[in-house]
Amino acid sequence: MVKMDVVRTTGFFLRSEPTTCRITTFAYSAEIIYFHAETTFLFEKIMKEGNELEKYSKIELNSEIWEDEEEEDNSGIVSQNERLMKLVNKQREIIYELHKDLEKVKKDNTSLRMRLSKYESTDSFPSSQPSRANSPQSDSYSSPYEKGKLFPKISLKSSKDVPTASAHISSSDHEKSSSVSLSALNNYNKTTDIKARSLDRLSDMTRPKLLLNTKRSHRSSEEPGASSPVTSPILKDSQKERIQALRNKAIKTYSVSTESAERIDSIRSDNLSPLSLNTSSFRRPITKPTPFNSDSNISIDPKDNNSNKQDHFAEIEDELRQQFLDIKVGRANASSPRRKSISIVKPHGISSPKHSTNNLSSKSGKFHSDFRVVSENVLLQARSETNSPIIENKEANNFLAPTSNVPAYSTPARPTESPPPPPISSSSTTPRPDDKPSLPPRGLSEDNDSLSLQKTGSSDTRRSSFSTLKIPDSDICFTRRRSDSNRTWTVIDPHHSQSFDNDILAEIPTSKLDNSSQKSPGKLSSKGLLNSFSPISPFSKSKSHNHHPSSQVEKSTSNSKGSMLPLDTLYNNKLSFRLDESLVRYLRFELMKTSLASLSPDFDCIGLQFVVGVSASSHLASQWKDEVWSFTRSIGECRSFATSFVLDIGAPPFPTLDWFTNDSSVIQNELLRRSVDTYFRYIFQTDLKLEQRIKLLEFLSSDTLREYLHDVFFLPPEHAQKEGVLLKYIENSGLVSRYFYLKDNILYFAENRNSPVLGTIHLKDAQVNRYNANLPIFSIIDPPHEFLTGENYQSAFVIQEKQTETRTGTATVHVLLARDVEDQKSWLRAILRQVPGSTSPLNASPFSVLSSDFPGSSRYRDQSSPIRFYGKADSRPVSQEAILSQDISSSPSPVLPPSENVASYADDSLVSNLTMSPKLRDSMEQVPLENHREFEISDRVSELSFDSSTGSVLEIADTRRNQDAPEKHVPVIEIQSSRPSLEKTDQSTPVELLIDSHSQNSQNEEKRSRMKFWAFPHHKAENYEQISDTNIPVIETNVMLSPSSTTSAEPLQKHIVRKSGIFGLPLNEAVNISTQFNDSGLPIVVYRCIEYLESCRAEKEEGIYRLSGSASTIKHLKEQFNEGVDYDLLSSDEEFDVHVIAGLLKLYLRNLPTNLLDTSMHKLFELLPNVPNDSAALGELCDVISKLPPENFALLDSLLHHLRRIIAFEKVNKMNIRNVCIVFSPTLNIPSDIFMMLILNYDHIFTDISRQTNGAQNESDSDVSDDNGEDNEFF
């Protein structure tokens, strides 16, 4: 018990120093009175809350009795009420124990008074009345010194020396107030059945505690004269030593940390009176001090200054109110990193005392402030009943004076006789922990003017001290380090000569600093706040080599106004700055991205990558440019930061190893990433203190990449040359709509307009091509499905970036799809203008193609490289000189790295030099300029043919005649080659492309179906019939295809003869062949597969379409369909697994040369967001689907109907709509969002009217109607 400790410790003084014991006992009694009043208040409050809770719980219980027992929520509510009742009972029991403790303390206090009265009856003090002891039943206690006014005057202590929480008043007054409070508490206890009503237990830190580490040694002060009828006994030296030993022992028996005292004070702050008495923080005594005497005796002054009693207590009340405000402000600034030493100034006419100064401690002072409170009624009663103010003189010793920092506002300067203080040395800025700041003794001048002057000066100094909190400029310096990127920054310790002296800053009036820091941004200099920073790291060079930082400090401190002048900043780096208070306060952080940078078996070694956006508030908006900070930290570093970074209650905790299990590494990684992201996002969004902001910047300052926000492309560029929507192919996702911006040789793309940029495409040294399925540039792409083949994608184009160390392979190839051919041409014109070296569309950068990857080209290749063909971006004619003066070799081309797809052609070079033969130059000179055909981007059509006889000459021509001038000949470029050329024939025939085949026995049907751009090097060449037309102009070259050319189905049908095979045929041809066997209107493979699956009830097979079947069986069935076209799976003698048939259906759909939705993809993307909520959009969607070709519509209708049957049994087969979309979205090359939208709106889209508009036959219409009937069966 704390009270028992008080009694035992007080007993140490009983045998040697009775007067001091009386004072101590009365002080403790005042504290007991306060704690009685406080406990009574808590008792009333908790009893009221307990009654309300009990009443509420009874009402709830009664209401629950009348409710039906069938309700499931009854048990939960009853259990909640029971818990509330248990909580209330527990609270009552614990407060009952608290009252028992208080009753015990009252008895101990009574026994202590009896012992003290017995001791006083035997002392040698003369008294006007005989001493009498107070009985335990008495309500008041009178001291023998009360009527004689023999109580000594004790001066009030300084702000850090008085440990008690109440004023030192006379014994009678104190006993009266004590008896009043105790009797009130007893009466309250009589009216309240404490045993019947138990209270909530308060925490240990709210229990009443008394301070034991108290310094109570006094010096006697005697006034010469015969007016002192009573003198205190003189203690012997042995008694002094014993008392001193007992006090030292009392210190060791009780100690309370500052943090626990702060918690106690925070809990009681709501219940304390504003008129709190804080004798531990008084800055001046109340009355005039008596002369000091070297003896440690106490002299009693019987004279009472009754005339000044009212003024005296008025000063007490003013001081109390001032101290209450100071305490509130002082707590907020208690953790200030700055510290100032106060110089002692002695004015003339005042003699200094003969003892040393007292040592103060901010730590002990804060602890004392927790016990400084006395209720207002006690103070008023003391003011009305006391007869003599108490004055206490302090003895100069180091008893109970711990070493700590002294806040500047707690120690006002005392006037002395010394001259003005000398300059404070720089060593005082960083004192050692053992240094003990000094405090002048308590003494004032004789006149009231000096008293008021000191009071005013003290308050001004105090207010100016905590009005602003300066940060030492030498703490943190953010600057760039020398590195490869030259953007890494960290903390660099500045030179000693560049650091400021904190004491010099302390001498400057803070009001001047406040005025300078509150200037508007418009009044700042050209460099703004950066001019007020200290010199930065030694990596930056100063503007003047003769200018030294020390002279700046001298110049700033010698200002006549007393304020610090802005220093000349050595600001030579855009991304370097010094930490400043205003900069720290107004910086705002936003966590943009958190990702796992590296994995490790050790939890603390896991790396995390952070991307933080740094902006400034309105105060620094004109001086700060938004930046992006990227840095990597390990889990160990983050946890150590979280341990030292104290947040409020309710903040998200930092993840620990106990959070994670061994279930799934993917889930664990995502949980770790989200937990860390949540923790730091809370830190960046909460309102941090200045010290917390400094710690946060220190955490962010190590090895951090700083870039301006617009350099990181998180925001779309302004004033773009061209912008619009394009479809972009993404691996495993298909075509995705993106919004593109073209500016400064960079193509930015975002999800929507004005949304954050997702990525960039650099056009410098890039290859730009119109889409062609045979371009070898696609050999490095290997997606799981195929698309963009044939004439249906004439609006597509491809950009291949220059490969670097960080970007290689498929990351450099971008397939883009415009709305139509005109949109494609406009984008290509804009892109060609951005290519370096091209000043206009007439001088556009050439397209380049790597031809060595084509089948059959390796046998003809030599050391030369592919040709760069020149394309035009507009329709204006090209002059002869412009074509002949083109320097092809001046435009570098990126080199494709060897890959597994082009391993056999890795030795080919990618840069070629174009040379014109004399025959070509002569032919071009003979043709008039107006008859030259433009090299249009979208008008080139190529054909493929192989020369099986010679296999040595490649011929390039244009299949389209010039309709405007049919009689003119098309000029032909001839390129030097090591191969012999064919004989030239009549040049009036159309030009065709002939390619020799290196394999005569290849399978045409398989190669036709798999001639896709990403898998082209894996396929063998197809057998084509040699064209017998000999009227073809000859061009000698080692390449075979222009990148600006595309395939056309119409001319190919005239010259290419295919073998029979259903896989890979266009959809309309496959339907025409299927009509020989059934009238379903579907390809025969689709019809047989769906028929088999539905007859075998595949919808009840778990994992249908998700599990793979036998690859050999699927290949065998594919050959059966290719050879005989129709293969009845149900009537076959062999039984097939449903997963095999499902795999066969997916294989056929994957090999379709065109997309089912064809050109309707763009319109569906526009309708996608509005379809679920807008009937008009749904009607427009039906209209778009109804305009599909009949074959596409019928296949899409049957397939979606079949998949809806699969989804209807999702509980059995585990294939919900999401899983079905995951499987068929890449198979059909339809985005999953659109595919899901088609499935969900199937009933609204595929109606009989829509089928009739597609021109379906009557039989097929009836079949489809039957399908709808089945659909109604399952939905």
Swiss-Prot record:
PROSITE patterns: PH_DOMAIN, RHOGAP. CDD domains: RhoGAP_fBEM3 (cd04400). Pfam families: PH, RhoGAP. Its main location: nucleus. Keywords: GTPase activation, Nucleus, Phosphoprotein. The record marks 1106 as: Arginine finger. Residues 1260-1275 have a biased composition (Acidic residues). It is found in: Nucleus. Transmembrane segments: none annotated. Residues 1065-1275 form the Rho-GAP domain. GTPase-activating protein for Rho-type proteins. This is Probable Rho-type GTPase-activating protein 2. It comes from Schizosaccharomyces pombe (strain 972 / ATCC 24843) (Fission yeast).
